[in-house]
């Protein structure tokens, strides 16, 4: 049995993770820690799953790594600087793995993969991500990652800038720009997590869309990460490799 602790256990995602861990046949929930809780309750875990906040996650990971505990992270707010901090910390603990994923939904991961494959064929590309209004970051980590993948594929294909003749606009009307790709964020009551990637060429468009209607859709990926991180020392970003998509 894999002994699992959950940080952020009382949040929406943390609650769902606790339930998924308890229901899986090969995992055991040994600690459910929330804000203000005692992290030492997780000292006996094989893996800590972190769904906390961008302000708390790095301190949580430093604690876990220093205690030689593997981690699976769904908390947002990661950038190159934070990834490098983790690499430096993990270098002193060569047998410990840390998996950080912008999205644990298998469908969302496939959506990003398909978008990366399609990007080199289309002159235009934009992203619309839609989430519940309690989400604290915009654009979402999934949208940022998708934009980065699209930009890399476009560069490899020799495509230039996305065509856009806009000269006059209201502030924010064209969304944020992530590595040359426009990203639009919607926050609406009733939504959970949704994203569509729009591609365009002469005479046609292609839309790749994924919808998560319930947080249970993320649990298969979380459990895949819990099982997989034990065999992946160092830093792993995304679950694509665990799904055979790399």
Curated annotation (Swiss-Prot):
GO biological process terms, semicolon-separated: diaminopimelate biosynthetic process; lysine biosynthetic process via diaminopimelate
Pathway note: Amino-acid biosynthesis; L-lysine biosynthesis via DAP pathway; (S)-tetrahydrodipicolinate from L-aspartate: step 4/4
Catalytic activity of the protein: (S)-2,3,4,5-tetrahydrodipicolinate + NAD(+) + H2O = (2S,4S)-4-hydroxy-2,3,4,5-tetrahydrodipicolinate + NADH + H(+); (S)-2,3,4,5-tetrahydrodipicolinate + NADP(+) + H2O = (2S,4S)-4-hydroxy-2,3,4,5-tetrahydrodipicolinate + NADPH + H(+)
EC number: 1.17.1.8
InterPro entries: DapB_C, DapB_N, DapB_N_CS, DHDPR_bac, NAD(P)-bd_dom_sf
Major localisation: cytoplasm
Keyword tags: Amino-acid biosynthesis, Cytoplasm, Diaminopimelate biosynthesis, Lysine biosynthesis, NAD, NADP, Oxidoreductase
Xref: PROSITE patterns: DAPB
Pfam families, per database record: DapB_C, DapB_N
Top-level enzyme category: oxidoreductase
Binding-site residues for NAD(+), renumbered to this chain: 8-13, 74-76, 101-104
Subcellular location: Cytoplasm
GO (cellular component) term, any one: cytosol
Family annotation (Gene3D superfamilies): Dihydrodipicolinate Reductase, domain 2, NAD(P)-binding Rossmann-like Domain
Active site: 131, 135
A GO molecular-function descriptor: NAD binding
The organism's place on the tree of life at top rank: Bacteria
Annotated binding of (S)-2,3,4,5-tetrahydrodipicolinate, by residue: 132, 141-142
Family: Belongs to the DapB family.
HAMAP family assigned to the protein according to its UniProt record, in alphabetical order: DapB
Functional note: Catalyzes the conversion of 4-hydroxy-tetrahydrodipicolinate (HTPA) to tetrahydrodipicolinate.
Protein name, as recorded: 4-hydroxy-tetrahydrodipicolinate reductase
Organism: Cutibacterium acnes (strain DSM 16379 / KPA171202) (Propionibacterium acnes)
Gene name of the encoded protein: dapB
């Amino acid at each position: 049995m894999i002994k699992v602790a959950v940080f952020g256990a009382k949040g929406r995602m943390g609650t769902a993770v606790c339930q998924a861990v308890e229901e899986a046949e090969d995992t055991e929930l040994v600690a459910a820690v929330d804000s203000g809780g005692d992290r030492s309750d997780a000292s006996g875990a094989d893996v800590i799953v972190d769904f906390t906040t961008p302000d708390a996650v790095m301190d949580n990971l430093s604690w876990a790594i220093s205690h030689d505990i593997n981690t699976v992270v769904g908390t947002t707010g990661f950038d190159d600087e934070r990834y490098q901090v983790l690499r430096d910390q993990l270098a002193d603990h060569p047998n410990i793995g840390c998996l950080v994923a912008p999205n644990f939904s298998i469908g969302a991961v496939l959506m990003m993969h398909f978008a990366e494959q399609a990007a080199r064929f289309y002159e235009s590309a934009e992203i619309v991500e839609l989430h519940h209004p309690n989400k604290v970051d915009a654009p979402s980590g999934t949208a940022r990652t998708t934009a980065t993948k699209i930009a890399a594929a476009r560069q490899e294909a020799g495509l230039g800038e996305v065509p856009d003749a806009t000269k006059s606009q209201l502030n924010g009307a064209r969304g944020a720009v992530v590595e040359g790709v426009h990203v639009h964020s919607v926050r609406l009551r009733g939504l959970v997590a949704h994203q569509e990637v729009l591609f365009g060429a002469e005479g046609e468009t292609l839309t790749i869309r994924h919808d998560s209607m319930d947080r249970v859709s993320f649990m298969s990926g979380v459990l895949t990460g819990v099982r997989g991180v034990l065999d992946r020392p160092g830093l792993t970003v995304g679950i694509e490799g665990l799904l055979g998509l790399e």
